[in-house]
C-alpha cells in the first residue's frame, strides 16, 4: 500500500485506537490530528503517533486535514455537522471522508445536503470500551472485530477498496452495508441491548432496599449489564439519533416479554421451554457463524491465593512477557464458572500463550 496521510478530527478512544493501530502496522503512515484535549495531543506526540496536531479547527487546520488521503471524523456525533461545514471547502477531491458513529442515516443525510457524496464512506467499528479518551486507546481494540462501511452510491470503487484495505490493516473485518439496514441491525444488536441493560440495572436498584441484590450481583447479572457502565451521554445521543428503529424493536421486545409473563402466570411450561430452547440454539450458533473468533470471548479463569499482591503478581507475569490483558477481575459469585480470577485477552493466541505461561508458574487454569 502506498504511503498514506490520515487525518483525525477527534483523538479519543476510537480515533486514538485507529491511529495507534495504523501506526503500529504501517509506521510510515503520516497522522495529523485535531482535538480540544491538549493532554491527548501531547500524549499522541509523545508516543510518536502523530506528526502534526491542532488544538483549534481553524482554516489552517482544516486545510491540512482536508488534504489527507483519509479523514476520520471521530469527534462526538453532535459536532459532525459543524466540523463538516468547516472542512468542506478545504476537502481534496481525492480525500476519503469517513466517520465512526454507530448511527449512519443522519450523517448520510448531512453529506448529501453538503454535496460530499463522492468523498464519503460511512464507518462504524463494532468494538469499544466503557473507558474513554486517548489514554485508554489501544492498537488491538479492533482485532477481529467487524467494521461496517456504508459508502454512498456516488463514491468510487477505488476509494471503497482503499478503505477496506485500511480497515484490514488495523485488524478489523470490513463489511459493506446500506446505511438504513445498518441502523436497523445495530438497533437490534447494540442499541436496544444498552436500553435493556440500563433499565435492568435501574429495576434492581429501585427494588434493592437493603442492598442485598447489589452485594451478590455477579456472574450472569454482571455479564448482561456490563454495557450499562458505558457513557450515559454517548448513549443518550445514539438513542436520540436512531429513535425510530429502537422504538420499533422495543415494541417487539415488550410483546416478547408480555408473552413470557403470560406463560409464567399460566404455568405454561411448554411455552417456556420452547422459548428458552429456541433462544439457546440461536445464541449457541453465534460462535460458529463466521468460522472466525470475532464473537468468541478469549477468557481464562484461574485460582489465586487470597493474599496481598496476588492479582498484581499475575498481571506482572503476563506483562513481562508482552501479553496484553483486555479485562481482569475477581469473580465473587462463581456458580456457573470455574476459577476465582477472570482474565480476558484480545485474541486467542494471547489466551493460549497466557495458559502456557501461567501453567509454568503453577497456576490452576480453566480456559473458556
Predicted regions: what is each one?
Residues 282-368:
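A conserved regulatory-domain signal marking ACT and ACT-like small-molecule sensing domains
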Residues 58-91, 95-96:
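Rossmann-like NAD(P)-binding element
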Residues 83-134:
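Rossmann-like NAD(P)(H) cofactor-binding subdomain of soluble oxidoreductases
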Residues 119-156:
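Active-site capping/gating segments
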Residues 1-56, 61-65:
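NAD(P)+-binding Rossmann beta1-loop-alpha1 motif at the extreme N-terminus of oxidoreductases
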Residues 210-279:
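Interdomain hinge/lid region at the active-site interface
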Residues 141-229:
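Internal alpha-helical scaffold of NAD(P)-dependent oxidoreductase catalytic cores
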Amino acid at each position: 500500500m502506498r504511503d498514506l496521510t490520515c487525518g483525525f478530527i477527534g483523538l479519543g478512544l476510537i480515533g486514538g485506537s485507529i491511529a495507534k493501530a495504523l501506526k503500529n502496522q504501517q509506521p510510515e503512515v503520516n497522522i495529523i490530528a485535531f482535538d480540544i484535549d491538549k493532554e491527548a495531543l501531547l500524549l499522541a506526540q509523545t508516543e510518536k503517533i502523530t506528526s502534526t496536531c491542532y488544538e483549534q479547527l481553524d482554516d489552517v487546520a482544516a486545510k491540512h486535514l482536508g488534504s489527507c488521503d483519509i479523514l476520520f471524523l471521530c469527534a462526538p456525533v453532535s459536532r459532525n455537522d459543524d466540523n463538516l461545514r468547516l472542512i468542506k471547502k478545504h476537502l481534496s477531491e481525492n480525500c476519503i471522508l469517513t466517520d465512526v458513529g454507530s448511527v449512519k442515516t443522519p450523517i448520510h443525510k448531512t453529506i448529501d445536503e453538503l454535496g460530499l457524496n463522492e468523498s464519503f464512506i460511512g464507518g462504524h467499528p463494532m468494538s469499544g470500551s466503557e473507558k474513554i479518551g486517548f489514554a485508554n486507546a489501544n492498537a488491538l481494540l479492533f482485532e477481529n472485530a467487524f467494521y461496517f462501511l456504508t459508502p454512498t452510491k456516488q463514491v468510487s470503487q477505488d476509494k471503497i477498496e482503499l478503505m477496506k484495505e485500511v480497515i484490514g490493516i488495523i485488524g478489523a473485518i470490513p463489511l459493506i452495508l446500506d446505511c438504513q439496514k445498518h441502523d436497523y441491525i445495530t438497533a437490534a444488536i447494540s442499541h436496544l441491548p444498552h436500553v435493556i441493560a440500563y433499565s435492568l440495572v435501574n429495576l434492581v436498584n429501585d427494588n434493592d432496599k437493603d442492598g442485598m441484590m447489589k452485594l451478590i450481583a455477579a456472574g450472569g447479572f454482571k455479564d448482561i449489564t456490563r454495557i450499562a457502565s458505558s457513557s450515559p451521554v454517548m448513549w443518550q445521543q445514539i438513542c436520540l439519533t436512531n429513535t425510530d428503529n429502537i422504538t420499533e424493536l422495543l415494541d417487539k421486545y415488550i410483546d416478547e416479554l408480555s408473552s413470557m409473563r403470560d406463560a409464567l402466570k399460566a404455568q405454561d411450561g411448554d411455552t417456556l421451554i420452547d422459548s428458552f430452547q429456541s433462544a439457546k440454539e440461536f445464541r449457541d450458533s453465534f460462535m460458529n457463524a463466521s468460522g472466525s473468533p470475532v464473537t468468541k470471548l478469549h477468557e481464562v479463569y484461574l485460582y489465586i491465593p487470597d493474599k496481598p499482591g496476588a492479582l498484581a503478581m499475575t498481571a506482572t507475569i503476563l506483562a513481562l512477557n508482552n501479553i496484553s490483558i483486555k479485562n481482569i477481575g475477581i469473580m465473587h459469585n462463581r456458580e456457573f464458572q470455574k476459577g476465582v480470577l477472570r482474565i480476558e485477552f484480545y485474541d486467542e493466541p494471547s489466551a493460549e500463550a497466557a495458559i502456557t505461561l501461567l501453567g509454568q508458574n503453577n497456576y490452576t487454569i480453566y480456559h473458556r
